[in-house]
Curated annotation (Swiss-Prot):
Ranges annotated as spanning the membrane: none
GO BP term, example: phosphate ion transmembrane transport
The name this protein goes by in its record: Phosphate import ATP-binding protein PstB
InterPro entries documented for this protein: AAA+_ATPase (IPR003593), ABC_transporter-like_ATP-bd (IPR003439), ABC_transporter-like_CS (IPR017871), P-loop_NTPase (IPR027417), PstB-like (IPR005670)
Keyword terms of this UniProt record: ATP-binding, Cell membrane, Membrane, Nucleotide-binding, Phosphate transport, Translocase, Transport
Gene3D superfamilies named among the record's database cross-references: P-loop containing nucleotide triphosphate hydrolases
Organism encoding this protein: Leifsonia xyli subsp. xyli (strain CTCB07)
NCBIfam families in UniProt: 3a0107s01c2
Length: 259
């Protein structure tokens, strides 16, 4: 688990609209990388290109390369379903399957991929995934109850458990704490710090303090105006981005002068 991501000259389009322009960067394994920038700058769109989730929108396509340990996710014959198994996604709002039990939520991805699994192996996978998401001790006595009955923070950790149950190499998180209270946010941030020991993690956040707390490296995106493509302005170690950025636009954003 945990893979290196290399992006070369990536451009993202929705039909004729150029959404993200000419991004190149490398994300090292077992690290947390934060994408920051104003609304509409393309950071979430770019995040979705890392597991081809943007393709659910009709007319979406990319030019350029996304390599995971040297393998191009956009190569001829590459199955997007297999890509999304390798590169998991946690969304902005917790989205457990409301009619499924906690246990079945964890196993949902495994069953979707048609993996046959014994009850013993399933039990072990459920426990291991919930432990990996720091949720086991809170739910071990109610695994057969609906996941929708959990608190917001617990639901988000359940979604993380569901994501890691299929053994991905990379975890993408699109503003995973934006709908959570401060205590639940802290629990997710602590979990991210633990998960990076096993996964490559990329997180989109509007919270500058969160980016500075959880990430090793930070990419700042911005946009010149309505209808213009988002651009990567600066990518560096997080402490440099927040203390001594090279671009004036980065300094203006992280210091709160705009954005």
């Amino acid at each position: 688990m945990s893979k290196r991501i290399e992006v070369n000259d990536l451009n993202v389009y929705y039909g004729k609209f150029h959404a993200v322009e000419d991004v190149s960067l490398t994300i090292e394994p077992r690290s947390v990388t934060a994408f920051i920038g104003p609304s509409g700058c393309g950071k979430s769109t770019f995040l979705r290109t890392l597991n081809r989730m943007h393709e659910v929108i009709p007319g979406a396509y990319v030019e350029g390369e996304v390599l995971i340990d040297g393998n191009n996710l956009y190569g001829a014959g590459v199955d997007p379903v297999l890509v999304r198994r390798q590169v998991g996604m946690v969304f902005q709002r917790p989205n457990p399957f409301p009619t499924m039990s906690i246990r079945d939520n964890v196993l949902a991805g495994v069953k979707l991929n048609n993996h046959r699994i014994s009850k013993t192996d399933a039990d072990d996978l459920v426990e291991g995934s919930l432990r990996g998401a720091n949720l086991w001790n809170e739910v071990k006595d109610r695994l057969n109850l609906p996941g929708s009955g959990l608190s917001g923070g617990q639901q988000q950790r359940l979604c993380i458990a569901r994501a890691i149950a299929v053994s991905p190499d990379v975890l993408l998180m699109d503003e995973p704490c934006s709908a959570l209270d401060p205590i639940s946010t802290l629990a997710i941030e602590d979990l991210i710090e633990e998960l990076k020991n096993d996964y490559t993690i990329v997180i989109v956040t509007h919270n500058m303090q969160q980016a500075s707390r959880v990430s090793d490296r930070t990419a700042f995106f911005t946009i010149a105006g309505t209808g213009k493509p988002g651009k990567l302005i600066e990518y560096n170690d997080t402490n440099i981005i927040f203390s001594n950025p090279s671009a004036q636009a980065t300094e203006d954003y992280v210091s709160g002068r705009f954005g």
